[in-house]
UniProtKB/Swiss-Prot annotation:
Protein-lysine methyltransferase that selectively trimethylates the flavoprotein ETFB in mitochondria. Thereby, may negatively regulate the function of ETFB in electron transfer from Acyl-CoA dehydrogenases to the main respiratory chain. One of its GO terms (biological process) is negative regulation of fatty acid beta-oxidation using acyl-CoA dehydrogenase. SUPFAM superfamilies: S-adenosyl-L-methionine-dependent methyltransferases. GO terms for molecular function: protein-lysine N-methyltransferase activity. PANTHER family: ELECTRON TRANSFER FLAVOPROTEIN BETA SUBUNIT LYSINE METHYLTRANSFERASE. Its EC number is 2.1.1.-. This is Electron transfer flavoprotein beta subunit lysine methyltransferase. Its main location: cytoplasm. Belongs to the methyltransferase superfamily. ETFBKMT family. It comes from Xenopus laevis. The keyword tRNA processing does not apply. The keyword Transit peptide applies.
């Protein structure tokens, strides 16, 4: 699994986040919940010590196993990506942004930002990811933080009619120009239709930094990444939270 974990980190760090289309599951026999409990570690990152997550770490057996032995699609949910770290820290430090509101964590992965939003007092939080295994990981992460599991939806919401969200958060999602264009159009419609606020977390990867969306972003906060996150993400040192204001 070391090769898989390193591949995922390298793909996001050097150029982009990997393709969001998860590989088909290789088996239906394994119970995701039991598998995640057995093959991940409950840990916390120095940037957000308030939140504990089940992640793939160097101490996990699959970190060094052959990737083909992994029974599910690529485990993007098992890594705490830098954009998500920055978003989570920002929400924890600024609970007034979520308090009493309806929050969508788009492409949630491990669900840290959704958990941070709930900790900040959001009235409703929906975590969304196209990988259903991410949903099981998210539920376990909620339990790990002594929370009743929040709602999770395993569908591609981009391009669909959005609900009246007060806040949409997304981290590490600007990894492909075509997807970024679709995201921007969809987020604009939500802002204009519902007055939704949009926060984006990204550590400054190439696709994000060169995309026209930067003209419509206002930086809100920048955070230094932990030494381990820097090492795993090939030279990225900081992660920024932006407000999307088209």
């Amino acid at each position: 699994m070391l090769r898989t974990a390193r591949f995922l980190q390298r793909s996001i760090s050097a150029t982009s986040r990997p393709n969001c289309i998860v590989q088909p599951q290789r088996t239906s026999a394994t119970c995701p919940r039991s598998f995640i409990l057995q093959h991940t570690e409950a840990t916390s990152d120095p940037l957000t010590p308030e939140i504990r997550l089940r992640l793939l770490t160097p101490r996990c057996d699959f970190w060094r196993q052959k990737p083909e032995l992994w029974p599910y699609g690529d485990p993007y949910w098992a890594i705490y990506w830098p954009g998500g770290q920055a978003l989570s820290r920002f929400l924890l430090d600024n609970p007034q942004i979520v308090r009493g509101g309806r929050v969508l964590d788009l492409g949630c992965g491990c669900g840290a930002a959704a958990i941070a939003a709930w900790m900040g007092g959001a009235s409703y939080v929906l975590a969304n990811d196209i990988d259903p295994v991410a949903g099981e990981a998210f539920r376990l992460n909620c339990e790990l933080n002594n929370m009743k599991p929040l709602d999770f939806q395993a569908e591609n919401l981009i391009g669909r009619e959005t609900g009246p969200w007060s806040l949409i958060v997304l981290g590490d999602m600007f990894y492909d120009a075509e997807l970024a264009d679709l995201l921007c159009d969809w987020l604009r419609r939500s802002i204009r239709s519902h007055g939704t606020k949009v926060l984006i977390g990204d550590p400054g990867r190439a696709q994000f930094s060169s995309h026209p969306v930067l003209r419509h972003l206002q930086p809100l906060a920048q955070y230094s990444l932990s030494d381990s996150t820097k090492e795993e993400n090939y030279g990225l040192t900081d992660s920024t939270v932006w407000s999307f204001e088209p």
